Amino acid sequence: MPTVQTPSQRRANTQFQKNITRRVKTNSKERYVAKHPPTKIPRNIAMFFILLMSGGIILGILRFLLTFFS
């Protein structure tokens, strides 16, 4: 036998469902990405290390060439 809700219970239930829906909408990933765009710091750090290592390789080649042709 189904339970009959009182009007105050029905209102509370409706309000609860509205709050749940609102919370789900505000916690969505799209909204989070819109508020907090991904940073470029990891990419910048990676580029720095790539440039640093390629500079070291170029210096090593130059040093080898200088010792080879001297």
From Swiss-Prot:
Start and end residues of each stretch annotated as Disordered: 1-20
The protein, known as: Protein tam14
Record family assignment: Belongs to the RAMP4 family.
Purpose of the protein: Interacts with target proteins during their translocation into the lumen of the endoplasmic reticulum. Protects unfolded target proteins against degradation during ER stress. May facilitate glycosylation of target proteins after termination of ER stress.
Polar residues compositional bias, start-end: 1-19
Organism annotation: Schizosaccharomyces pombe (strain 972 / ATCC 24843) (Fission yeast)
Cited InterPro entries: ER_stress-assoc
Highest taxon of source: Eukaryota
Alphabetically ordered keywords of this record: Endoplasmic reticulum, Membrane, Transmembrane, Transmembrane helix, Unfolded protein response
Membrane topology reported for the UniProt record: Single-pass membrane protein
Compartments (UniProt record): Membrane; Endoplasmic reticulum membrane
A GO CC term assigned to this protein in UniProt: endoplasmic reticulum
Membrane-spanning residues: 45-65
Pfam families reported in the protein's UniProt record: RAMP4
UniProt induction comment: Differentially expressed during meiosis.
Any one of the GO BP annotations: response to unfolded protein
